[in-house]
Amino acid sequence: MTTPADLTLSQAASLTSGSDAWHLQGVEGTDIQAHMITDGPHGLRAMIDDGNMDLSHSHPATCFPPAVGLSSTWNEDLTREVGAAIGEEAIDQSVAVILGPGLNIKRHPYGGRNF
């Protein structure tokens, strides 16, 4: 298994940016692989074209209830089922990381989630 100590400075620095908006780059010659990431706090939003940021240009996916809705049911089994279903969709789309749900993030009326 590759550790940070095994990387050159250049290789380690390359891990601080992605290969594009939706992919973390790997390091050639190591076991650090490239990974696809997606956005979507209510499920998966895998983009069809890596360079396209148009929200309508994504693979079809299920829109699950938001975390606040699921938590208000107090139904732990249902919440686990939703998590498993999101995981199955991620595996189907070869997605390694889902950026969401938003949990304890700073919100402000002037800046939403500050981006």
What are these regions (language model features)?
Residues 1-115:
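N-terminal beta-rich core of secreted/periplasmic extracellular enzymes
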